């Protein structure tokens, strides 16, 4: 059994610690456990309870109503919300709950439901990436371990790869060529895999190199493949203290090809403008870029 502090519960559910204390005093529906030194903590069952409260309160239920529900009634109400494809926060919490408990079946069923109801692109935008941002906060606060992150990321990667493989390969010699890669020491691959899906779904050719590609290898590949566009996503601070150094190394090893950059490091840094470089803020912008006249006509 894992032990969660009230700060952990706040980080996971979004319910403020002050609010939790007030609810406990007013409604007494959760009684925190105490250590031998009288420090409050919560267990896995309590966490699931608070996640259900978060789901219900974010969807119009008043706490006075929720406090009168039995555990079974609460689960039933959340299940009804989960059946609504327009409720991304419920699905984010379902993924969070199943990650914390390493419940692969629940994680995959939630993922499958969202994709069937909304398609992969909307699922990534509305559910997966908000979920991953939440995982990031939980990792920073020590609520989850690397094992939790690897568990959820691997399941999402498997689904992405399966969906990408199901798309038809492009044999049109006039189609644009995209080179997708992550630079040396960058291993966060979900954004790049989603870019792979978008590019392939629009009927373009893709050479996908994946994570942590040495800079000097880009020189060889870009000469041999002659891509129209090169795409990378920068996420980890481990790759370099200065994101502009990373971009400079990438550009030095390309041969004038257009570079598309995105990712958390790009958004949080002062990136210097460069010739033939496009900075994209989010997934919606990326989808619009791939379908735009810039790509379709290649400046013709």
Q: Residue spans of the language-model regions?
A:
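Short glycine/proline-centered loop/turn elements that form peptide/ligand docking sites
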Residues: 9, 16-18, 211-214
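Long amphipathic alpha-helical segments
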Residues: 12, 16-21, 25-168
